Curated annotation (Swiss-Prot):
Official protein name in the record: Kunitz-type serine protease inhibitor PILP-1
SUPFAM superfamilies xref list: BPTI-like (SSF57362)
Signal peptide limits: 1-24
MF term (GO), any: serine-type endopeptidase inhibitor activity
Homology family: Belongs to the venom Kunitz-type family.
Subcellular locations according to the entry: Secreted
GO CC terms: extracellular space
Role, per record: Serine protease inhibitor that inhibits trypsin (Ki=55.62 nM).
Domain BPTI/Kunitz inhibitor residue range list: 30-80
Gene3D superfamilies: Pancreatic trypsin inhibitor Kunitz domain (4.10.410.10)
Site, as annotated: Reactive bond for trypsin: K40, R41
Tissue distribution of the protein: Expressed by the venom gland.
Length: 82
């Protein structure tokens, strides 16, 4: 295979990788209900609500949780809103 063909193949693979949508495996914390169990502390956090297609605020109790909480609405939207 010539170097030009290899370069074209590399370019196409790079383009494919950039344009492929992110799967739900990469966003596990976006698809779960928020953990509202009370533990060591109560702080405001945000979770993604797929029905509302928005990040909503809730009281996070500080437990180990399920990974579905974000410190800010901006971070939540960045990771989950598609």
């Amino acid at each position: 295979m010539s170097s030009g063909s290899l370069l074209l193949l590399l370019g196409l693979l790079t383009l494919w990788a950039e344009l492929t949508p992110i799967s739900t495996k990469d966003r596990p914390s976006c698809d779960k209900a928020p953990d509202t169990e009370r533990c060591k502390r109560n702080v405001y956090a945000f979770y993604y609500n797929p029905s509302a297609r928005d990040c909503l605020q809730f009281v996070y109790g500080g437990c180990d949780g399920n990974g579905k909480h974000f410190r800010s609405k901006a971070l939540c939207l960045f990771h989950c809103h598609r």
